[in-house]
Amino acid sequence: MTIGMIGLGRMGNHMRSRLRSKDIETIGYDIDPEVSDVSSIAELCDGLGTGPRIVWLMLPNQLVDETIEALVPLLRADDIVIDGGNSRWTLDAPRAERLAAHGVSYLDCGVSGGVWGETNGYGIMVGGPEEAVRTVWPVLQALAPEDGGLVHAGGVGAGHFAKMVHNGIEYAMMQAYAEGYELLCADSPVTDVPAVFDAWRQGTVIRSWLLDLCSAALADEPDLASIRGWADDSGEGRWTVEEAIDRAVPMPAISAALFARFSSRQDDSPAMNLIAAMRNQFGGHAIHNS
């Protein structure tokens, strides 16, 4: 089996390597010729042989539609396009319809595992029609860990929806560890915070891979002094909260984690400035001048 991989950045390059290590021939294309196997998308498609051809897109969401448009004249009926990036799930149905008009199947695939996935395997959540999923299943199994981590989540959009919720949960878990770290460091009786995090990794109910990463970071730099407390959000946390609002699903922990990231990017807080002013107005409470 040969597949094409378009987008060989931080994730795509490692995924190509893992597929090759599992004896799945993979032809990669990227705008960076240093990592690309071919010089164009057309050359990539020509190299995929006969039968249902599989093209995996590992691209930023904003590049997916234009890449699909470039692929349409190069694809044949029964080919399969997989979007493995972090696209919003609501975009999947229109993309599937666009390709279906040419007899091409579309699968949306949420992928988790980061830079460690090449070694440990990737968590894979795929959405789309059963027949197309069966065709690509050997590829998905090669990417996934040996003991699981692979699910056909449902129809078109289900893979990206599952990955969106996964990322929302990730936000909340990270925020909980971060708040615990701050309290341990805040004039507490604990004298070795990194050792506490390391001890939590074994036998406790809060052990996780994220906790392992916390422990590794604190082992490198216990006070994290070289790191600015600024946390970006990639968009999926926002989408999770928006979907919860649309469905009237209570989501206090994930919402708070998202808003905490917004707070991290403020040099000063206009909201807190006004609260301080109001406290001064009604109670004569002290104001700390900037």
Which stretches of residues belong to each language-model region?
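Rossmann-like NAD(P)-binding element
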Residues: 31-94, 118-127
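Hydrophobic beta-strand scaffold residues
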Residues: 26, 106-107, 251
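Helical "substrate-binding/catalytic lid" subdomain
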Residues: 135, 157-285
